[in-house]
Amino acid sequence: MITIEQLLDILKKDHNFREVLDADGYHYHYQGFSFERLSYDSRQVDGKTLFFAKGATFKADYLKEAITNGLQLYISEVDYELGIPVVLVTDIKKAMSLIAMVFYGNPQEKLKLLAFTGTKGKTTAAYFAYHMLKESYKPAMFSTMNTTLDGKTFFKSQLTTPESLDLFAMMAECVTNGMTHLIMEVSSQAYLVDRVYGLTFDVGVFLNISPDHIGPIEHPTFEDYFYHKRLLMENSRAVVINSGMDHFSFLADQVADQEHVFYGPLSDNQITTSQAFSFEAKGQLAGHYDIQLIGHFNQENAMAAGLACLRLGASLADIQKGIAKTRVPGRMEVLTMTNHAKVFVDYAHNGDSLEKLLSVVEEHQTGKLMLILGAPGNKGESRRADFGRVIHQHPNLTVILTADDPNFEDPEDISKEIASHIARPVEIISDREQAIQKAMSLCQGAKDAVIIAGKGADAYQIVKGQQVAYAGDLAIARHYL
């Protein structure tokens, strides 16, 4: 429960309070209200709900519906003049985060918080950290792929970083379940829209940066994207940073006065020997590590997670065991066909991650290589040119372009846009299952491979704003082995 007095105190301390408006005019102080629930969904309110009117598409009609369901007061940046009191604020998203934090009993103070950011690798690194910490502690995890609040049951995540009301409710459930640590992926969008406003992480990890999520509904420029990624560093007590990433010198200067540790080529924490399924490291994680996920970049993700977990109480033995146990749904999953050709299923969904995926496969498979690829509709439009550029640099690839969450766009138009950046012929098969079947039918022997990129473990396609059932790349590939 939270009272109106507590609520106003939170807003005033954050300089986010304008006034309370009701039929009698303006009020600096207010009383007589207490709330047992928080909501930003007008369909889920009653007389004891504190409702947040948020979003560029919010309509007064939503509020009218809530009032008919008993709503007595709401928080907003706008007075909709509907006859009930309104708490007016300058920034509704910041208000949501700080109020939710207090309403749910400040769960962030009862958990050790570890956050990963980066253009790619967040989910893999989060899974590594989860398995490392699980050796001696009780970690919960919020990731793009799956969320667990109790370490036993997993459910599909809706957002990389949940909305603040959901985030703190879930954190409180983690505390109730006896969890000791929480591992999170923190997206640039989470900072852009203040989902984690007011939250300080025990350790923040910056894996890498490359142009992505740049478009009309995301970040307008790379500078804006990079700035919002860096906010995790400002909001972490200690940081772990990849010294091999672009703009590392800037980040090193930024965190000079913070507790920090670097890994990669310009640091003392490096991988000294790398094999397909093992590596040796020097520095704080010196030792031998077995790993199921192939690729040097996955070994670096394991290093990043290990350095973070070392600070959070994990032993080197915990880290070694955790790395050896980690598998990630939809990340570098490998199947073998009856003719011994390989099928690689991976979530690679931007130019940089596609380049790394192709390089790893080419290292191990020297025959005919088939790539299945698409790009999402109505977001990250810059990826299409990036995909074309990467494919152009791998002339031995046979390419089939297909649907990948086309949303409100025509998947064939998206494929044609990607193809316009490739200087050789490619095939377009918009039905993703047919594209996979065709590619697999072209494999003849153990040196050949099909690379299915983009959707990973997703069992849906986003079409016209809705999630439409889709068997999933892995399930389809298994069917045609």
From Swiss-Prot:
Which residues participate in ATP binding?
G118, T119, K120, G121, K122, T123, T124
Q: Which GO terms describe its biological process?
A: cell division; cell wall organization; peptidoglycan biosynthetic process; regulation of cell shape
- Identify the domain of life: Bacteria
Pathway field: Cell wall biogenesis; peptidoglycan biosynthesis
Q: Which Gene Ontology cellular component annotation is one that this UniProt entry carries?
A: cytoplasm
Compartments in which it is found: Cytoplasm
Q: How is it modified after translation?
A: Carboxylation is probably crucial for Mg(2+) binding and, consequently, for the gamma-phosphate positioning of ATP.
Give the reactions, separated by semicolons, that this protein catalyses. Answer: UDP-N-acetyl-alpha-D-muramoyl-L-alanyl-D-glutamate + L-lysine + ATP = UDP-N-acetyl-alpha-D-muramoyl-L-alanyl-gamma-D-glutamyl-L-lysine + ADP + phosphate + H(+)
Q: Does the keyword Nucleotide-binding apply?
A: yes
Q: What is its EC number?
A: 6.3.2.7
UniProt motif L-lysine recognition motif: location: 404-407
Do you know which Pfam families this protein is assigned to?
A: Mur_ligase_C (PF02875), Mur_ligase_M (PF08245)
Q: Which GO terms describe its molecular function?
A: ATP binding; magnesium ion binding; UDP-N-acetylmuramoyl-L-alanyl-D-glutamate-L-lysine ligase activity
Residues binding UDP-N-acetyl-alpha-D-muramoyl-L-alanyl-D-glutamate are S42, Q158, T160, T161, S187, R195
Write down the top EC class of this protein: ligase
PANTHER family the UniProt entry points to: MUR LIGASE FAMILY MEMBER, UDP-N-ACETYLMURAMOYL-L-ALANYL-D-GLUTAMATE--2,6-DIAMINOPIMELATE LIGASE MURE HOMOLOG, CHLOROPLASTIC
According to its UniProt entry, what is the function of this protein? Catalyzes the addition of L-lysine to the nucleotide precursor UDP-N-acetylmuramoyl-L-alanyl-D-glutamate (UMAG) in the biosynthesis of bacterial cell-wall peptidoglycan.
Q: How is this protein named in the record? A: UDP-N-acetylmuramoyl-L-alanyl-D-glutamate--L-lysine ligase
